[in-house]
Curated annotation (Swiss-Prot):
<dbReference type="InterPro" id="IPR056940">
    <property type="entry name" value="PEX18_PEX21_C"/>
</dbReference>
<keyword id="KW-0963">Cytoplasm</keyword>
<keyword id="KW-0832">Ubl conjugation</keyword>
<comment type="function">
    <text>Mediates peroxisomal import of proteins containing a C-terminal PTS2-type peroxisomal targeting signal via its interaction with PEX7. Interaction with PEX7 only takes place when PEX7 is associated with cargo proteins containing a PTS2 peroxisomal targeting signal. PEX7 along with PTS2-containing cargo proteins are then translocated through the PEX13-PEX14 docking complex together with PEX21.</text>
</comment>
<feature type="region of interest" description="Disordered">
    <location>
        <begin position="172"/>
        <end position="203"/>
    </location>
</feature>
<keyword id="KW-0882">Thioester bond</keyword>
<protein>
    <recommendedName>
        <fullName>Peroxisomal protein PEX21</fullName>
    </recommendedName>
</protein>
<comment type="subunit">
    <text>Interacts with PEX7.</text>
</comment>
<comment type="similarity">
    <text>Belongs to the peroxin-21 family.</text>
</comment>
<keyword id="KW-0576">Peroxisome</keyword>
<feature type="cross-link" description="Glycyl cysteine thioester (Cys-Gly) (interchain with G-Cter in ubiquitin)">
    <location>
        <position position="4"/>
    </location>
</feature>
<dbReference type="GO" id="GO:0005829">
    <property type="term" value="C:cytosol"/>
</dbReference>
<dbReference type="GO" id="GO:0005777">
    <property type="term" value="C:peroxisome"/>
</dbReference>
<dbReference type="Pfam" id="PF25098">
    <property type="entry name" value="PEX18_PEX21_C"/>
</dbReference>
<keyword id="KW-0653">Protein transport</keyword>
<keyword id="KW-0813">Transport</keyword>
<dbReference type="GO" id="GO:0015031">
    <property type="term" value="P:protein transport"/>
</dbReference>
């Protein structure tokens, strides 16, 4: 893309054929007539000839012209004067038009022209095999640079604001978690006060759960990472806090399951008690097997069991 440098005024004047500062042909002819030397002898003879020839050859200024001729002469003189004035106005208008300066509002700005000239120079240099290094500040106008700076500042401000928001949100979550834990502890203490005191078996279970929870939750222990999120460790904590304990069956007067005294909710599977008894040694009825081989001893044990 290139900018046209042709002046439209010069084109218009060249087509009209008018040359500024030079006299026209009418003025040149009048000047030539005025510059010619006059021959007084010829003028005197011509005046005598016209006088001797009678009234038909009299000087035009002494002739009696009819009224129509007078009106025609007056009209011709007025038309000549009007044409002269019009021509003079026409020349003045051309001079004014030639001196007039036109400012095109749609013309490209100076910064853009400069940048485009650098772009053309750069393209020419690339075609010649010698690239021209153009700085980043010359490739972009100043207003675009200011827009980029403002955009970078806005992005930095938004990033810092987002980080601060995340930090505040994390602090709020920690505060809420602490408040929930404190409220949970208060509720647990309240429920423990409302429930009936523990009997001997429930107290022993609570002490055992406290010992297990203290051992497994120790950070220095090698097994702490394995039990940190286990349900078993959570159950031991609830038993040690008194939230969960043994439930006794009033009909059998035995503990059958785990439950929460505050809510009455049952935890785990149903408990089935196992009767404690000692079984006799099955080898007492077989006798001595020391003198037998392994196959004979196995056959004897099998027959006795059947």
């Amino acid at each position: 893309m290139s900018v046209c440098q042709t002046n439209p005024l010069n084109t218009l004047v060249s087509k009209s054929g008018y040359r500024f500062g030079q006299p026209n042909q009418h003025q040149q002819s009048i000047a030539q007539q005025q510059s010619r030397p006059r021959n007084n002898a010829l003028d005197h003879q011509f005046s005598q000839f016209t006088g001797a020839s009678g009234p038909s050859f009299a000087h035009p200024q002494h002739q009696q012209l009819p009224m129509a001729a007078v009106v025609a002469n007056a009209t011709t003189a007025a038309s000549t004067t009007s044409n002269t004035a019009t021509a003079s106005d026409h020349h003045v208008w051309i001079d004014q038009f030639a001196n007039m300066q036109v400012h095109d509002k749609t013309e490209f700005p100076t910064d853009y022209k400069q940048m485009y000239s650098q772009y053309e120079a750069r393209g020419a240099s690339y075609s010649m095999g010698a690239p021209v290094m153009v700085s980043h500040s010359q490739m972009f106008p100043r207003h675009q640079q200011s827009l980029m700076v403002n955009q970078l500042e806005s992005q930095a401000y938004a990033s810092s604001s987002a980080k601060l928001d995340e930090q505040f949100a994390e602090l709020e979550r920690q505060v809420q978690d602490d408040e929930k834990e404190q409220q949970q502890d208060k509720d647990d203490d309240f429920h423990l006060k409302e429930t009936s005191p523990l009997d001997e078996d429930q107290r022993q279970l609570k002490e055992a759960a406290q010992s297990i929870y203290t051992t497994l939750s120790d950070k220095s222990s090698t097994t702490s990472s394995k039990f940190s999120n286990s349900k078993f460790l959570g159950l031991m904590r609830n038993i040690s806090d008194g939230v969960i304990t043994l439930k006794k069956n009033p009909d059998e007067d035995k503990y059958t399951e785990l439950y929460s005294p505050s809510t009455g909710e049952t935890f785990g599977e149903e408990y089935f008690p196992v009767q404690d008894s000692v079984l006799g040694d099955p080898l007492d009825s077989i006798g001595d097997l020391s003198n037998m081989s392994s196959s004979e001893a196995a056959a004897k044990v099998y027959h006795n069991s059947v």
